[in-house]
A protein has these predicted regions:
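Beta1-alpha1 glycine-rich phosphate/pyrophosphate-binding loop at the start
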Residues: 1-49, 132-176
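Short amphipathic alpha-helices and their capping/turn segments at secondary-structure boundaries
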Residues: 2-4, 66-71, 217-218
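Short, hinge-like loop/turn segments at secondary-structure boundaries
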Residues: 25-29, 96, 181-182
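Amphipathic coiled-coil/heptad-repeat helices and related helical stalk/stem segments
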Residues: 36, 110-114, 178
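Amphipathic alpha-helical segments that form well-ordered structural scaffolds
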Residues: 39, 113, 147, 181-185
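Short, conserved catalytic or adaptor-binding loops enriched in Gly and charged residues
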Residues: 40-45, 93-97, 184-187
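A Rossmann-like FAD-binding core segment of flavoenzymes
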Residues: 48-57, 62-65, 150-220
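FAD-binding core/adjacent interface of flavoenzyme oxidoreductases
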Residues: 49-143, 150-156
Length: 220
């Protein structure tokens, strides 16, 4: 039970609540895209004050948050910043997405295109990429690799496919406890791993991807 004198405000500009964690499953045809999207008004608690605005500046000495439509004071502040996608960070990626079998699961609409591509697969080369941190959900790029491999296996096309996971990190996952099991999963599906490979450009029409490879000291 909340104390009657407790006032909670949530600064959130979005009209929709997006369950982004499920977009990997949408990309694998295992989840409905529409089930990942709800009006923000339906998930916002009724007992809070919803400030539909962007937080722009913190003034901790003044216990104040500046937003796009005014200033708000507080006694306690909990900051939950997100990440903004930057498809322009890879040359040619923005222009290539959604066609010529160039996909991403970091968008609900694009995740449905991932599934359209997977459904039509009969083999070939599949590249799964993970950029440098920070990114949303470091496991997402490899989860779709496993799901795609399993889909190909069920279709009897895994042996006709060349799957490769190219990761900007020097290891498959940042938590050592999981590195062994994840590498075993890759081995079971025949997924090749290439670490310290960062995607820098895409040409969807010619189906070419260029990566920058670095050593443990960051030299390219």
């Amino acid at each position: 039970n909340l104390k009657s004198n407790l006032k909670i405000s949530i600064i959130e500009p979005s009209d929709k609540s997006l369950y982004q964690a499920a977009w990997t499953l949408v990309g694998a045809g295992a989840y409905d895209k529409n089930s990942t999207i709800k009006p923000m008004s339906e998930v916002m608690p009724s007992y809070v004050n919803w400030i539909k605005s962007y937080a722009e500046t913190f003034l901790p000495e003044q216990n104040t948050v500046k937003t796009s439509d005014g200033d708000y004071t507080y006694d306690y502040l909990i900051v939950c910043p997100g990440l903004k996608l930057n498809f322009d960070g890879v040359e040619g990626l923005k222009e290539s997405l959604g066609k010529n079998n160039v996909c991403t699961n970091y968008s609900a609409e694009m995740a449905t295109y991932t599934w359209e591509c997977l459904k039509q697969l009969v083999g070939g080369t599949l590249l799964f990429t993970e950029p440098p941190m920070p990114i949303k959900c470091a496991g997402a790029p490899q989860k779709i690799a496993y799901l795609a491999a399993d889909h190909l296996k069920k279709k009897g096309k895994l042996n006709d496919s060349n799957l490769e996971f190219l990761c900007a990190k020097p290891v498959i996952f940042g938590v050592p406890h999981f590195q062994g099991p994840l590498n075993e999963i890759c081995d079971s599906y025949g997924i090749k791993r290439s670490f310290q490979h960062n995607l820098i450009s895409v040409d969807g029409q010619s189906k070419e991807a260029v990566f920058k490879q670095s050593d443990k000291d960051g030299n390219t």
